Amino acid sequence: MTTNKPATWFWVVSAIALVWNAMGVIAYIAQVTMSAEALQALPENERVLLQSIPTWATAAFAIAVWGGVLGSALLLIRKTWAAPVFIVSFLGILIQIVHSFFMSNSIEVYGPGGMVMPVMVLVFGAFLIWFSRKATENGWLK
């Protein structure tokens, strides 16, 4: 393994990854700390959907977003652990998507447009696995 200096775009992509995953953490915290008043203000179909999310799906959400933040931080401090952490995060994403698309009525509630963000999250999660592996191959991560 070499100790090559990362290209500038490595830092840009890593910083974007951290911001993206931090937004996921904010969404997670907003969901799990939603007040009864905020929940009641939602349309009934959205409220019922949120209240029906099983604990394991919420845990998958937590693993996905916190794993993404940790993986991004590991990229920024140039550690090879980034790739395995992103893989765990990706598994959380997959579990969440399986629940949303196949075990709940989220598509009925949000419409086909509601599939866009989860698919973007899935694609970006896969990209971060690839990116962290390439960074390791390039000797940018130790």
Where are these regions (language model features)?
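Topology signature of small-to-medium multi-pass alpha-helical membrane proteins
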Residues: 1-142
